[in-house]
Amino acid sequence: MAKQIKTIDYDSENDIFSINNGEKVKASIDIGDFVLDVNHNNFICGLEIMSASENLGISKDVLRNIRSMKMSVNYKTNHVYVLLMILFKKEGKEVNVPIPLTLDLGHKTPRKEMLIYN
């Protein structure tokens, strides 16, 4: 079952995009311009992207106008694959943004999880 994304925030002045599902954060992991928040079960519960417009290839104006969003997370034994599916208010179109990350969160078996905001 999909988890609900509780908050989406875009700070256009600092160009920082963040989402979280409201779970308590055990640790934050910095990977370049990306910060992953991990819960006590070692699952991603939040994501922060610095220089978001550049890293996502999306204008600041568009990032201010997100209507809905899904974040698919595939946990493998030695990496995590995050896919953001963003629907924008103005254009009414959806953009898929893949974020492959090499990160071992200690998962012994592959698992997929979906977080949704609408």
Where are these regions (language model features)?
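Intrinsically disordered terminal and processing segments
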Residues: 1-31, 40, 51-118
